[in-house]
Amino acid sequence: MGNLLSKFRPGCRRRPLPGPGRGAPAPLSRDASPPGRAHSVPTPRPFRGLFRRNARRRPSAASIFVAPKRPCPLPRAAAAPLGVLPAVGWGLAIRKTPMLPARNPPRFGHPSSVRIPPPSRMFTLLLPSPREPAVKARKPIPATLLEETEVWAQEGPRRVKKDEDPVQIEGEDDEKRTPLSSGEASSTSRSQGTQGDVASFRCSPGPLEGNVYHKFSENSMSEKAQASPASSCLEGPAMPSTHSQAGCARHLGKPDPDATAPPEPAVGCSLLQQKLAAEVLNEEPPPSSLGLPIPLMSGKRMPDEKPFCIPPRSAAPPRAARNRPCKRKMSIPLLLPLPPSLPLLWDRGELPPPAKLPCLSVEGDLHTLEKSPEYKRNSRILEDKTETMTNSSITQPAPSFSQPVQTTDSLPLTTYTSQVSAPLPIPDLADLATGPLILPIPPLSTTPKMDEKIAFTIPNSPLALPADLVPILGDQSNEKGGSYNSVVGAAPLTSDPPTPPSSTPSFKPPVTRESPISMCVDSPPPLSFLTLLPVPSTGTSVITSKPMNSTSVISTVTTNASAHLTSQTAVDPEVVNMDTTAPSQVVIFTSSLSSRVSSLPNSQIHCSAEQRHPGKTSVYTSPLPFIFHNTTPSFNQLFGKEATPQPKFEAPDGQPQKASLPSACVFLSLPIIPPPDTSTLVNSASTASSSKPPIETNAMHTTPPSKAVILQSASVSKKYLPFYLGLPGSGNTQPSGNTASVQGSTSLPAQSVRAPATASNHPLNPGATPQPKFGAPDGPQQKTSLPSAHDFLSLPIMVPPDTSTLVSSASAASLSKPAIDTSDMNTTPPSKTVILQSTFVSRKEEYIRFYMGLPGSGNTLHSDSIASAQVSTSFPAQADRRPTTTSSHPLNTGSISHSTLGATDGQQKSDSSFILGNPATPAPVIGLTSPSVQPLSGSIIPPGFAELTSPYTALGTPVNAEPVEGHNASAFPNGTAKTSGFRIATGMPGTGDSTLLVGNTIPGPQVIMGPGTPMDGGSIGFSMSAPGPSSTSGELNIGQGQSGTPSTTSVFPFGQAAWDPTGHSMAAAPQGASNIPVFGYTSAAAYIPGLDPPTQNSCSGMGGDGTRSIVGGPCVPAFQQCILQHTWTERKFYTSSTHYYGQETYVRRHVCFQLP
């Protein structure tokens, strides 16, 4: 086709481009080959050098006419339209030979050959009649609808070939061999097998599809446009009925004396028009509102809004329209068929999903519908889908309904009218997420006839559904694979009756991204309400489920029950009250189980029923538990943050232990996690009295996820608060978090004490802390109460999974897990951690408790930026009968509670409490401790630093503290802190007295933390106190000179000690005096003006003005080594004081250090 089409750029249509040689190009035409030549006329190539230069400055296309080489049967006109083909020489003589340049005169052989201009970017193609490419079938259009269309093509001729190649003729090879003469050109073309196609092209060409950009190539020529010399007569808008010389001359204009008439008769064209017109009527109409054909495949338009098409052979110039008065130039509107609508997916921002219409599946007496055609059609589907209900070996039969029984306690219902239809099959599990919500309702008492509209009632509100209603997911599939999603009965609600005060569950449908739900009834068996639920059994089931999405009600639920009491059962829809909640929410409700169980429709549920025994707890964990309890079928309150947990645990002293939890208790993410293995609760001991209390979830409360509260204890008394119990071999590790925390570790001897060793392990809480009280295990029971302002919202209650090393080589006859009495428990903000801290027995004063411990624990220091403390206790071979309570707590910014440490006999004595330190207003104390002998540096004191005291209950002579009149302790003011580390090596022998905790000297470092006291002249004062008889007072003076050499001081008169010059160890002898080496480690001490501590009055002073006093951390003689880590803000001088409490004496000495 490249040699048949031309590129035009008429000057009247397009503005000539600037520059020399870019005038209006002359139209392109071709001449016929001479009779003796077997090649086709060369086609202009899209190269500039192949054309003559003067061809670009030719006159406009209106004055160009085609001059064939030999006489043409058609008359030639002077103003013939450009691109008119000659009448002869266009048969099958087509060869795929390379094109020759137009400036080669011997090729053309005719003096009147037209010079071909170079191709341009924009050209106009006049289509005499568009047609469709011969891909599958040609779709011609009647000649009455033909119109010439003038379009502008904007692209190059690259993609033209693929639209013209499909119409290549089969007689092409004959043309290469046999040249045609002028007399046999037209007859030869009609004698070929494509004569019908040629006639159809001349008379009524169809719409042309494809790209309009044609590539001028020697390989693309079409016989359909060549076969007839009279095809040039089809340029006009009105097709002549006969193709004669007059008709052609009318369109060609000036006649040619050498032209001859075409030999084709006029009848053949008219018959072809009638035949093709009938074929068009049988085809689909084009998508056009104007009734006009769309000649374009893609409907692409050019900037001038003119659709474009392709001429099969050539096109006439625009100026030739003046010679054709019947021609109309019309831009066919662009009408493209819209692509098939795609389903818009939800959650992608397009449109919400359609409303899922819950259908009430009325299942009752199915005998009335056995003869129904719908029943027979759906019965086959029911048999195929009932086998896909479970994913295990448990068979879950379809729910059966009782005979029609009219009950008097039915709920007020709303009347609906529905068309009688067949009972619906149970949908497959794959349809759970896509189908509407189906709610089975009990059958009515009336039996309707076939194809009769029945009126029955359904609950007006989803919260007032009967107790036996279970939500069913899935849609109803018909025999063709479709779904019955249409609303059969959609009568509006007529009334809103109140809910009767009966024990009915609350049904909450999913509300997230759901459209308004309309109830519809899709099956008409006889309706009747079910009978009452069976009597609750003694078995308790805990059903756990994973989080579900908003479209599904129930996910696959599995319960892992105990191995000895596990029975795989299913949940009967009559006894299970399932509720639909949000994916991240959990519903804990109660339900009774019976011997007759069946499956929940459209949900795979495995329930493990376990028989409850006193003293044993069965709670199964899962991300989303559904807890069923053996009570009357009713929903408990949904969980809420406003509900407060009230668990109550009683001692296992014969009475059944019960954990009472509020009915609104649901854990959002982490449920109660008991130890999975408690068979090794006591090592090498009898577990006759060890038992786990059952947990009753009717009082359980919820806690936010990722928070936890650790409560563990091994007390004997009923009312003991279960703190963290640390015994030897437990492998406790220090917490590693930004929040300060403590950890206790207790090492028991071979013969352990009868009393439990309780250690409290809690991170610090900036708020108020609880005040637990510890009493004797064999005396009056002391109740553990927590302040009402505390709640364990941060972390759920958890128990260590392994307690095999809870007691080592000891009898566990008196050991048991105490119950938790949370009657006084309260809530706190979720982001806070509860610190359970013991209190002092102080009748009139409050003290800030510090650090207490014994050597030999090998504890490690917490590595957080926030201060923390660590406790360790080592018992001798001959331990005391009294319980040893080690409390380790970091100091917080809020008020710190105090603990009461009572005697072993349970009686609070005047000397049963040991108080150290001056009375002071509670203030935050933060610091870091280290078990090594090397001091730490970098500790920073927060604002409001105060004194530290340490309780000690195991010493023989505790002091009941009564502060001296008029004495007050001072605190450091707010300001920038500085650090300085000191190491004090002390030693104390053991006398073997049962009143002393340490019977023998136990090696190992011990850590104590306390603030240094800045004094005048660059000294640091540190306070140390020790209990003793009323006539005994201890004093320890530690100093350091400018040279840095250690100084010696006298130790308490408990014994005489000989110190090692290295300061790392020392030996002590009782009832003597010894010197203790003191090594001072200071760091970057600087004076900060304007930060003076408050002036205080003191009883006595040493080496100072006696006007200011501040207390540091204590150092009890029982410690083998004391590593002092303190912080100060100024260098001031402070005094010491002595307190007298009745017949007992409490001595406090301030040790001064001289700073460089």
Curated annotation (Swiss-Prot):
Superkingdom as given in the UniProt entry: Eukaryota
Which cell locations does it reside in?
Nucleus, Nucleoplasm; Nucleus inner membrane
- UniProt lists compositionally biased (Basic and acidic residues) regions at 156-165
Q: Name one GO cellular component term.
A: nucleoplasm
Bias regions of kind Basic residues — which residues? 50-59
UniProt note on tissues of expression: Testis-specific in adults. In fetal brain expressed only from the paternal allele.
Which GO molecular function entries does the Swiss-Prot or TrEMBL record give?
nuclear localization sequence binding; structural constituent of nuclear pore
Signal peptide stretch: none
List the Pfam families. Answer: POM121
Kindly state which keywords UniProt assigns to this record, in alphabetical order: Developmental protein, Differentiation, Membrane, Nucleus, Spermatogenesis
Region (Disordered) residue ranges read 1-60, 155-204, 219-266, 481-515, 680-703, 732-786, 872-915, 1026-1046
Name the InterPro entries on file.
Answer: Nucleoporin (IPR026054)
Q: Name one GO biological process term.
A: RNA export from nucleus
Q: Where is the composition biased (Polar residues)?
A: 179-197, 219-231, 680-692, 732-750, 884-915, 1028-1046
Q: What is its main location?
A: nucleus
Kindly state the subunit structure of this protein: Associates with the nuclear pore complex (NPC).
User: What does the function comment of this entry state?
Assistant: May be involved in spermatogenesis.
Protein name as catalogued: Nuclear pore-associated protein 1
Q: What's the source species for this entry?
A: Homo sapiens
Gene name tied to this protein: NPAP1
